[in-house]
Amino acid sequence: MGGSTSKNSFKNTTNIISNSIFNQMQSCISMLDGKNYIGVFGDGNILNHVFQDLNLSLNTSCVQKHVNEENFITNLSNQITQNLKDQEVALTQWMDAGTHDQKTDIEENIKVNLTTTLIQNCVSSLSGMNVLVVKGNGNIVENATQKQSQQIISNCLQGSKQAIDTTTGITNTVNQYSHYTSKNFFDFIADAISAVFKNIMVAAVVIVLIIVGFIAVFYFLHSRHRHEEEEEAEPLISNKVLKNAAVS
């Protein structure tokens, strides 16, 4: 963790968010033949390496219901942070329990900026049809690709200010924590030791206060017991003096 830099880019964060949204919506997306369309008209046309990557059918009512579920944003933020970890982007857990870690910062960023309406709109954009039409004679079409997958969600996110704010915030958060751990490994260790030492000192103070309390209670009870013994001894002494006086 220390001594190595793990910079996260805006593009990488955008891809992670779009992939996470796509994965969260898997139950609403099904494969459907014939959704994309390639039309070739004429004679002598040559097509090489023409691909249709993904044919999709989207259940929009399922999408609407899914994004409005109470735990949707939480599940989405969990998947985004997990994807960041899987791509070896440093996610530092801070030693001080009172400080927000990256995961908390990312969750707050998503909840504020990545609205369910935006997510629903971007997922719904998957239902568009890709069309490739070639007309005439003697045309050569090579390396033509029709993509209808996470890239569409990614393009949609890049067209939204809220999504851009989310992506920028997550990218900066990851890089900020990564910079902290990589800038000076010994500073990180020193902070960790300081946090542990601080906790030990607090525990020691509590123990000392408990011991002082026990001593105070013991002293109070002991003094009270001696006082009671002295009060009981005074009548006995007086009676003894009276008896000696009578004998005399």
From Swiss-Prot:
A lipid is attached at G2 (N-myristoyl glycine). The chain crosses the membrane at residues 200-220. Keywords: Capsid inner membrane protein, Host membrane, Lipoprotein, Membrane, Myristate, Signal-anchor, Transmembrane, Transmembrane helix, Virion. It is found in: Host membrane; Virion membrane. The keyword Lipoprotein applies. Its main location: host cell. It comes from the Viruses. GO terms for cellular component: host cell membrane; membrane; viral inner membrane; virion membrane. Residues 2-199 are cytoplasmic. It is a single-pass type II membrane protein. Residues 221-248 are extracellular. Belongs to the asfivirus E248R family. Interacts with A151R. Essential for viral fusion with host endosomal membrane and core release. This is Inner membrane protein pE248R.
